[in-house]
Amino acid sequence: MSKPANNLQDIFLNGARKNRIPVIVYLTNGFQIRGIVKGFDNFTVILECDGKQMMVYKHALSTITPSKAILFNTPAGTDDRS
C-alpha cells in the first residue's frame, strides 16, 4: 500500500513545527493565539504559548500567520508529524 502525498496544510504546519517558527493563529471568533506549533493531526493543532501547551481544534481556526516564510520544497514522502 502506498503512502498518500503530503498536502499543503501538512507541509505548512510541519515546516512551522520543525523550524520552531512563531505563528499567530486567528480563530473564527476573532481571538488570536501566539505560539509555536508543537504537533498536529487531522483534527487538532498543539501550540506552545508562554510555556503552556494548548490544543486547538482545526474547525475553530481561521488563519495561521507565520513570523517568517515557510518553504514548500519538502522532499516527497517525508511526513514527520511527531
Curated annotation (Swiss-Prot):
**What terms describe the molecular function in GO for this protein?**
RNA binding
| Keywords associated with the record | RNA-binding, Stress response
Q: Which SUPFAM superfamilies match?
A: Sm-like ribonucleoproteins
UniProt-listed Gene3D superfamilies: 2.30.30.100
Sm domain span: 10-70
Q: According to its UniProt record, which protein family does this protein belong to?
A: Belongs to the Hfq family.
| Name recorded for this polypeptide | RNA-binding protein Hfq
Taxonomic lineage: Bacteria, Bacillati, Bacillota, Clostridia, Eubacteriales
Q: Which gene encodes it?
A: hfq
